[in-house]
Every structure is written in structure tokens, then in C-alpha cells.
Amino acid sequence: MSSSTHHWIARRGTALQGSLAIPGDKSVSHRAVMFAALADGVSQIDGFLEGEDTRSTAAIFAKLGVRIETPSASQRIVHGVGVDGLQPPTEVLDCGNAGTGMRLLAGLLAAQRFDSVLVGDASLSKRPMRRVTGPLAQMGARIETQDDGTPPLHVRGGQALHGIDFVSPVASAQVKSAVLLAGLYAQGETSVTEPHPTRDYTERMLSAFGVEIDFSPGKARLRGGQRLRATDIAVPADFSSAAFFIVAASVVPGSEVVLRAVGLNPRRTGLLAALRLMGADIGEENHAEHGGEPVADLHVRYAPLRGAQIPEALVPDMIDEFPALFVAAAAASGQTVVTGAAELRVKESDRLAAMATGLRTLGIQVDETPDGATIHGGSIGSGVIESHGDHRIAMAFAIAGQLSMGQVQVNDVANVATSFPGFDTLAQDVGFGLETAGHR
């Protein structure tokens, strides 16, 4: 979708007020469909994210012979075929924009008896895949990439996999998950040790589906040959989507919002710690557990933020929230320093460069480094922002527009539907000044 046909005009609205139901967690939705498809029996998924990425994953499993019913937009009923019941696809498997889908599927499909090809959109086709194909090759998998290690992935079936003790050079939940899923089919035990703990959605959900798996922060181990038992999953609200409203309510004077039943996986919530370090007023109420995941209502009130040094230990736990954090830093008094975040350069866009360039366009001083940036808080001006088709960049600058002295035009926003369908409507409902222009 070209920037000229679909963009936002963001300008100051009102103080943000309301109680919000954020769409379901994308990471949990991907895994819920995958594991339900591999389980013995029928699983019901409630709170499923009806976004393009998760629809791509569900469509892939339909092509692999799994029957999936859709009683409502946020519900899926999955008729599992068992770990050995997937059928050979008759066409390529299109992951769309979903890096999670492609990397996890690489681990799963590497163990099947048939060949398959995983493709993605223009953005996903630029993303690095050797971090996944490397350890899978150590297990005996045969996966071919482009010469530069990017998709498409040609997965050769019929390989006998063996367990490995993998010491990952990168802190990536997707790499860990791909190895663990291949490990379900491998001879012997498979373990993953990480340089820093990452999100443990895969471990928690495999356990919910009856798999015996030992895991602690930074480590996971399972043995091959186990089966999955069907189970019903309630998907929590997506923290990464909630993040935009958490930041917006923190920086727009007079705001007070409640975000209901948000997933608070401890490996996901680094943004809360970072914002609290900057002086944010964020309360947690009604703690519960959904599908093995901790959830709570978040009560966010406006508070003046001050710049801070963001601890590197928080970086893996907020890697998707940095676009929102950069806007909080721009609104804060003083300097905010981010280091240890080189991973941001290989997301849907080079998010460090995109955020730095965009904030400079709006008059904010940003000193970029190879693995981070120093953001100098100040007054946010007007300008035209290129989101580079990155949904999180687009939503971050919609927040910036709420503090603008004029207006912020955010181009190329169609991809917001990959993770947060209906973001613009929900934002308008709580008080954002936000208009959608052009054609979808």
C-alpha cells in the first residue's frame, strides 16, 4: 500500500479517558493456533487476534490439512491432527509480515516428511533467517535461504532430527522457539541456553498443552517424541499493542485510562519498568492467569516524565516497545539514553534509524549510535513522517501527534492491521486527534 493512498493526520485531541479492551496478544495467538493444530483433539481459542499476521498463520495450517472454524472474529476452534498429522501443502506457505510465524514454522516444518516453502511480504523478505536455520541445521534439518540468509525458506522434509544443546548467540524468543519445536520431533533431548532471558510464551503454552518441559529464565529443555493434548486457551490482551496507550496516557496531560486484562509476561514488560523509572504513574489491578500467562488491568494516569538511562537488562524485555518509548523520551524533560538495542535495526524496519529520523523531523534532537540513541526531550513540532510500512513506527508517531504544536502526517500506515486492527478507531474513542486519509 503506497503512502499516498493511506496515511494518518495526527494532532492534539483531548485528555485520554476510558476503559479499553485491547486486541489479543499476537505472540500467544500465533502459538495457540500452532500448538492446537499439533494437539490430539479439539481446542477452543478465545481472544484470538484477528490481525493479518495471525490470519496468515491460521491459513498456513489450513493448507497443512488442519480444520479451523471461526465462530466469531476473536474465536477459533482448531481440530488438531496430532504431531504427525500435518499434510503436504500444494502451494507455497505465505507468512505475510509475520516473522514469528516464519521462524517458528521453520522449526516445525523442518521435522515433517514433506517439502515446503515459506515466503513473506517485502518487509519479511529482508529479515535475517540464518539465526534460525543455523541451529536447525545442527539438528539435521535442511533449509535453504537466499544467498544473504533471507526468505524464501525452502524446507526439505524427511530428515531425521537429533537433539542438541544449543547456546544461542542472540537473545531471541523466536530462535529459541524454533529449536524447541524441532526438538519435539528430535531423537533425545534438546536444550536452549540464551545470553539473556527472553519471552517464554512457547514454554508456558507447550506446558499448557501437556508437554513436559523444564524452563527457567534463559534456559529451556524438552525431550522429543511427546504428544500435545488439546486444551482451551484464553488469549490475554497484547502488551505491545497496549504499550501505545500506556505511553499516550502517560504523556498527554489530564489523561487516565484503564487497559483491561493485559498480558504481563515478565519477559515482555520491560517498558513498564522503564516508564516507572521515568516517573510514570501505572497501577496494576485484578491479577489473574489466562492460558498460563499472567494478566492484569493497567491503570495509567498522566505524570510528567523525566529522562533516564534505560538499563540494558530491560532491552530484551521491551524490544517491540522502543518506538513507543522513544516518543515518551521526546516528551520527557532531560535526556533518555538507550544502549544495547542493536536488534532494533533488523525488525520490520531499522527502527532505530526510523525513530531517530522521524523525531528529528518533528524538532527533537536525537543522537544515534550503532546500538541505541540519546533522545533529548523537547517540544514536538509538525512534519511528515515515513513509517516505512512498520506498524509500530506508525502507531508511535500517532502518539507524537497528540503533543504536536501543529500536526503530524504519518505515511504508509496500512500495515498497522498486521498487529492492531482498529487502532485508529479505538484511539479516536479515547480522545486521540487522529484522521485516516486516503483509501485502504
UniProtKB/Swiss-Prot annotation:
3-phosphoshikimate binds at K26, S27, R31, S172, Q174, D320, K347. Its main location: cytoplasm. It catalyses: 3-phosphoshikimate + phosphoenolpyruvate = 5-O-(1-carboxyvinyl)-3-phosphoshikimate + phosphate. GO terms for cellular component: cytoplasm. InterPro entries: Enolpyruvate_Tfrase_dom, Enolpyruvate_Tfrase_sf, EPSP_synthase, EPSP_synthase_CS, RNA3'P_cycl/enolpyr_Trfase_a/b. Catalyzes the transfer of the enolpyruvyl moiety of phosphoenolpyruvate (PEP) to the 5-hydroxyl of shikimate-3-phosphate (S3P) to produce enolpyruvyl shikimate-3-phosphate and inorganic phosphate. This is 3-phosphoshikimate 1-carboxyvinyltransferase.
